[in-house]
Every structure is written in structure tokens, then in C-alpha cells.
Amino acid sequence: NVSTIQCKCNDPKHTHDNLIGVIDKVGVDDVKEYILASKDKYCKFLVTPESFHKVKKAFEELDMYMYSECFMLIDESHKLVKDADYREGIYLPLDDFFQFKGKALVSATPLELSDPRFNDFQRLVIEPQFSYDKDIHIQYTNNTLERFKVTVRDSKNDCICVFLNSTDTIYALMEKTGILEESTVFCANKSVRKLKYSLNFKNAYSRFEPKRMRKFNFFTSRFYAGMDIELECKPDLIMLSDVNLVEHTVLDPYSDMIQIVGRFRNGVNYITHITNTFTDYTYRSKEEVLREVEIYEINYNFIRRELGNAIDNGSQCAFRTLLKTSPFNQFLDRHNNKSYCAVDNYVD
């Protein structure tokens, strides 16, 4: 994401690595200028999925064949699945990815990808030869606010980091706990604007820098993966989920939690997860969910086929309406092709 790319490009460790961060404000001409200026150097593009088209366009305008000139690495590849339900652009470069002569995906928390184009890929698993287990104190509660108050009150640490994927809930926690003046929030640009201009909370940033930290530091999901948080101290780490108030605050113990703990390169002092739970949740197996998607797909393809065969306006209108309301639409990309990432996200 943007914040991770900005941090990498501004990290003194990468001063001589000839990096270019291709994000929203960087245009095709900027990329072309960088390529031409890097004639005797390796080019290293750090690109968001949404800005990948700029790199592609730059190579085309320079009459260079990107797919053989470059190696493509999709870092934090689990995001292809985890973010597919709300970030359509996350898998925009995927069709291009398979055209590269050299290509790979990497993640510390890889998820199974059902796209058949991955079937011939070799999978390399790196397993540490040392124990990397971390103790996590699970606090199950029916009142996440009150439990949060108790947790921060009992902490003796001068640095507390809280991961919670809802800026509205973050603000409510800060306000009701009375820690607004001691807090900083790291979140997306849109949320920064809301906090600063609608809620008059000034310590909100889209880019992480240690000097901006206060005693209480809140992070949304854009900071769950890919970023190095290097501190001189070992903070107390609080992960918070409130599934009844905001469902997208739910944390996956097999990916989100591992990624969050892994952000802190110098370790943490204490880890806790404050959470409640669904009261009416019905478990379904992976096979049951895939069968549901399969039936949606069969029905969608049948309607589309009938639309192609329809010759009168009434039938065509009816079939178009049925296509527009098909549940399978949530599993289509912007070209109306099946998105395996969206299917994997639904299963996950």
C-alpha cells in the first residue's frame, strides 16, 4: 500500500537502491524519466496495484517489452484474497503478472489461491529452525470499551500500540477513555481528513513515522502488513475486534494477527486481543461455500446464454435484469470475468 511504499522509499537503508514509488501522484512521464535516468542501473518499481498501469504504459511508450525486461514480485500476496471484497483494484495487475517471464509471489502468511493459472507454480516453504511462538492474552468480553479501559489503565508501558480497523470506533475509544490528547492515529488519507476536519482530531497521519507517536498509537488495516515498525522501546500491543459493532474489525489469527505482531522488528513487551463474538453465527464448511458459489455461477451462465439466444425485447429485458441481480456478480472482475480472488475471499 501507499504508506508502506513511502516508508521504503524514504528509509535510509534504501538510499542507494534506486527505488521509485509509483503511487497516486506519480505519473507516466515520471516513470519514463526514471527509466531513462536508470540506464546503467537496476530499476526497482514499488507499485500499488491501482498504479501498475502507469508502469505498463511507460514501458509501452518507450517501446520496451516489460514482460521480459522485468521480474515481477507480488509482495504480501495474501492481500490478493484478504482485500478482494472491498478493494477491487487489488488484483488488477494479475493478468499481466502471468505474462512476465520471471515472476513470483511471497508472503509470511500465504493463503491458498484457487486460480488455475497458479497450478504449475513451484511452492517454496521457508520454515524457521527456532521457536517463534508468541504468547497472546485473549480477553473475551461483552463490553470491548470497558475491557479496553481496564487494559490501558493496568499497563505500565509508555508506548501502547492498538490495531483496530475502524476509525469511527478508534475515535470513540479515545474520547470515552479520555486519551485524545495522548493519542495518534495512523490510517488512510480519507480517514485522516475525517478525523482532522470533521472531528477536529489533529494527530492523524496516513504515513507512519516514529517521531509522530505518542503514548497511545492506533493503526488501521492498511498498516497490518508490509511495513517495518522499528522502535527503541518494546510497546504493549493491543489488537481489538468488535464483531457486533463493526464486522470488518474481525482479525484472522492465521494472517492478520501474525502480520501485526511481525510489524515490530525489535519485538513487543505484551500482546493481547480484546474481542467479543457472534451470537448467531452458523459455521459452514469450505465445500458448502464452494457449492454455493458453483450454483450461482451455473445460474449466471445459464441466464447469459439465454440472453444471447433471446430474440424478442421482453425476453432480453428480463434476462438482463436477472443478470444484473445475480449473486454471482460479486465474483466478477471489472471485465465481467470470474475473479478467483473474490471467490477465495468469500471462502476465507
Regions picked out by a protein language model, each given a short descriptive name:
Residues 108-154:
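Interdomain hinge/linker at the junction between the two RecA-like core domains of SF2 helicases
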Residues 229-242:
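A short beta-strand element within the Helicase C-terminal
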Residues 185, 191-219:
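Conserved helicase ATPase core of P-loop NTP-dependent helicases/translocases
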